[in-house]
From Swiss-Prot:
GO terms for molecular function: ATP binding; glutamate-tRNA ligase activity. GO terms for biological process: amide biosynthetic process; glutamyl-tRNA aminoacylation. Its EC number is 6.1.1.17. The lineage of its organism: Archaea, Thermoproteota, Thermoprotei, Thermoproteales, Thermoproteaceae. The keyword Isomerase does not apply. Keywords: Aminoacyl-tRNA synthetase, ATP-binding, Cytoplasm, Ligase, Nucleotide-binding, Protein biosynthesis. One of its GO terms (cellular component) is cytosol. It is an enzyme of class 6 (ligase). A motif ('HIGH' region) lies at residues 112-122. Pfam families: tRNA-synt_1c, tRNA-synt_1c_C, tRNA-synt_1c_C2. Catalyzes the attachment of glutamate to tRNA(Glu) in a two-step reaction: glutamate is first activated by ATP to form Glu-AMP and then transferred to the acceptor end of tRNA(Glu). This is Glutamate--tRNA ligase.
Length: 588
């Protein structure tokens, strides 16, 4: 028996740990084991001891190790494989990419800047690029998907140290698996090497204080479409200036490396754009490499070099990168490299929801706040990866901007969780309903899920005393003279309502009688109901709260359980505090 219990404990401890950021809870694991294997309750003491031992072991592992073991032993628990398999049809229907059939190998990439956490908008390039990798892999093509952290701006777009792991966690949750991973701040020597090569072949030059081409003059001349002195200088002179940059001879703002482009371009930003700049490493240390470097490549230079060296064949990204694609062209041209095929898709806008990274950062909320459109926030709220995949693949890679409602996401999510979520009763703004004419005992048999009778029922017993019994109902459900059916319990006729109390006659348990009188069916809570509050996200950083009573069975559920409160909506159990259950509203 011990080996079987140990396996169960390991499985559920890993699931619990992965769900709650690497830390499993003994009580939650024990509850899950007993719920699935009630025959083990007779050996409760031994089971608890085994679980404690296993939980200690699991909690000593890193989150990555926990995920790896869970994926190896119980891959279905992560849901990632199911997500991808269910979306196979949508993936196959994606439009073909240019020359994909002619190339022997296809390589895609997702390249986030770890200056913030992934949100619904940034999930789009991750899912789209990975979906194309799968599309062609399913056809037998050699296809790769690369995760690349673009973190070479410690000054303006300063990386967050915890964002690297947070992004990895979000991608795994989405079911996105990468074949290779790179971090640009680990590749500085490579960028320096190619900067020298570009300067040597005349494709770049240095603008520096005291060089005959002052930075302020260079900016003015560029706007005028005129060259600066060092633009035509010998490469040896520019290499000398570049070495001085690396040695720390120039302060921030005193030297840059510029890529030669077209000074007559109608877009001034394309004219001789900055490839490297000096950043004060003591004032702006990089969170990963500290003050090791003072000369940092700009986004477009590092991306162009990496896309070539990593063999990227197709780039799928947002319309806002169109100018960047043009800028990067000049690096590819200078080296004689072939630029990847680039497909630009429109912006994804969610009605009434802020997806701007700069706006979200200013709110100073935790990344998993249930009001945020971050993937961590959506996951915490109860949105599934399957729903996000459905939404992103529905929008596709159209060039036009797409504006959708959150209702679209909720509709996709409802399809996923409706068959999984068992039904429970919750009474908002409760009033005590005193029933007259009841026997010593009445029972309600409530199905766990009306569409899945094999899940069974739960029995709620109400004890009568002297012909009376008490239950709780929603204040708006009772009016004098109204006949209602208390779900699964019986039919009552409301006699009077006064403040927080009401009185009704118990008139039988016949379902047929209720139908004939067209009695509305209402949810209710027994006398031993538990206090509960439901947090309802209204907008980013804003919530309202519904207080009420939940049936006792809800208190026995594992934290994180998604359920449907009858006549209310889908909710997720977040925990409890001071004897009150805390849940978050997902959607109706």
């Amino acid at each position: 028996m011990e080996n079987a219990v140990r396996d169960l404990a390991l499985k559920h401890a890993l699931i619990n740990a992965v769900k709650f950021n690497g830390k499993a809870d003994v009580k939650a694991v024990v509850s899950k084991i007993f719920a699935d294997n009630p025959e083990l309750r007779g050996n409760a003491k031994q089971v608890v001891e085994v679980v404690k031992e296993v939980v200690n072991y699991v909690n000593s592992l890193t989150l990555d190790e926990q995920r790896r073991i869970l994926e190896e032993k119980w891959p279905e628990a992560l849901g990632a494989r199911r997500t991808v398999e269910e979306k196979r049809g949508d993936i196959e229907s994606l439009p073909e990419l240019p020359d994909a059939d002619k190339l022997s190998k296809l390589t895609f990439r997702f390249a986030p800047n770890p200056d913030f956490y992934l949100h619904l908008g940034s999930a789009r390039p991750a899912i789209v690029n990975y979906a194309y990798k799968l599309k062609y892999a399913n056809k037998g093509k050699d296809s790769r998907f690369i995760l690349r952290f673009e973190d070479t701006d410690p000054r303006i777009k300063r990386p967050l140290l915890d964002a690297y792991d947070a992004i990895r966690e979000d991608l795994r949750w989405l079911g996105v698996k990468w074949d290779e991973e790179y971090i640009q701040s680990d590749r500085m020597s490579i960028y320096y090497e190619y900067a020298r090569k570009l300067i040597e072949n005349g494709g770049a030059y240095v603008v520096a204080k005291g060089s005959g081409c002052e930075p302020d003059d260079w900016k003015r001349l560029k706007i005028e479409g005129k060259p600066c002195l060092t633009r035509e200088a010998e490469s040896s002179r520019n290499l000398e200036l570049f070495d001085k940059m690396l040695e720390g001879a120039f302060n921030e703002g005193e030297a840059i490396v510029a890529v030669k482009t077209d000074l007559s371009s109608p877009d001034p930003s394309i004219r001789d754009w900055v490839a490297f700049r000096v950043i004060d490493a003591h004032k702006y240390p990089h969170p990963r490499v500290g003050d090791k470097y003072i000369v940092w490549p700009t986004y477009n230079f590092a991306v162009a070099i990496d896309d070539h060296l990593m063999g990227i064949t197709h780039v799928l990204r947002a319309q806002e990168h169109r100018v960047n694609t043009v800028k990067q062209y000049y690096v590819f041209k200078a080296f004689g490299w072939e630029q990847p095929y680039t497909i630009h898709f429109g912006r994804l806008k969610i009605e009434g929801l802020k997806l701007s990274k700069s706006i979200l950062k200013k709110l100073n909320l935790t990344k998993d706040d249930v009001t945020l459109p971050t993937l961590a926030g959506l996951r915490n709220r109860g949105i599934t990866p399957e729903a996000i995949w459905s939404l992103i693949l529905f929008v596709g890679i159209k060039e036009t901007d797409a504006t959708i409602s959150l209702k679209n996401l909720y509709a996709y999510n409802r399809r996923v969780i409706e068959p999984l979520a068992n039904r429970y009763m919750f009474v908002k703004n409760p009033v005590k309903l005193r029933l007259r004419g009841v026997g010593d005992l009445i029972e309600a048999k409530i199905p766990m899920h009306p569409s899945y009778p094999e899940r069974g029922i739960r029995v709620i017993k109400i004890t009568g005393e002297g012909g009376y019994a008490n239950v709780y109902v929603q204040a708006s459900d009772v009016k004098p003279g109204l006949v209602v059916r208390l779900m699964g319990l019986g039919n009552v006729k409301v006699i009077n309502v006064s403040g927080n109390e009401a009185e009704a006659d118990f008139i039988g348990q016949s379902v047929e009688d209720a139908r004939r009188s067209e009695a509305p069916i209402v949810q209710w809570a027994p006398p031993d109901a538990v206090n509960a509050e439901v947090i309802i996200p209204v907008n980013v950083g804003q919530v309202t709260v519904d207080n009420g009573l939940a049936e006792p069975a809800v208190a026995k559920l594992e934290q994180g359980t998604v359920m449907q409160f009858i006549r209310y909506g889908f909710v997720k159990l977040m925990g409890s505090s001071n004897g009150k259950l805390r849940l978050v509203y997902i959607h109706d």
